[in-house]
């Protein structure tokens, strides 16, 4: 069912772990290593419902495809997410939504954005290289932050660095001077 990354072969154990997390005790009997959980046994304190497979909850791929379909309908024009969601998450969403709706194409276009990188690494709380929007706004204007991201390719890692902010400030000054000159010319 690898539709978005068809030539990548078997999923690695790391990819499957990333995509599924810890499977509940009742879901160890997979028929194929690449099978994904449609229903998971709940951990203590998690929401759970009765089902023919026991008490539990939907797997996260089902959660996402159902929420998207509920709001947007049986077919989506554009579906977006981080580049790390291409496989297995988005492929799994496709597999189940296309099977449910009996369609060949649940989504027309996927946009997979690059991650935010700080000090050369993907931003992550666990790496302690994390910054909140509020913290960024204490040092930079919303316009500077927007320009910083607009100056980078959307599908590649986005760099948050002193140089990237400096480039954005320079562009902001350039635009401000340009539009100031245009206004002066129009006033005549």
Q: Locations of the language-model features?
A:
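Alpha-helical recognition segments enriched in aromatics with Gly/Pro capping
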Residues: 1-185
């Amino acid at each position: 069912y690898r539709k978005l990354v068809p030539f990548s072969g078997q999923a690695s154990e790391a990819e499957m772990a990333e995509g599924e997390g810890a499977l509940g005790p009742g879901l160890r009997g997979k028929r194929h290593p690449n099978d994904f959980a449609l229903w998971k046994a709940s951990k203590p304190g998690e929401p759970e419902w009765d089902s023919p497979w026991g008490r539990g909850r939907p797997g996260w791929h089902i959660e996402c495809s159902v929420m998207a379909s509920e709001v947007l309908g049986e077919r989506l024009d554009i579906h977006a997410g981080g580049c790390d969601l291409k496989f297995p998450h988005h492929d799994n969403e496709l597999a189940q939504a296309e099977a449910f709706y009996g369609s060949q194409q649940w989504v027309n276009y996927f946009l997979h954005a690059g991650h935010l990188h700080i000090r050369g690494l993907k931003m992550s709380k666990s790496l302690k290289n994390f910054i909140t929007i509020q913290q960024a706004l204490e040092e930079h204007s919303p316009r500077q932050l927007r320009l910083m991201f607009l100056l980078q390719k959307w599908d590649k890692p986005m760099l948050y660095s002193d140089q990237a902010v400096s480039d954005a400030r320079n562009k902001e000054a350039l635009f401000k001077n340009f539009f100031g000159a245009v206004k002066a010319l129009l006033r005549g």
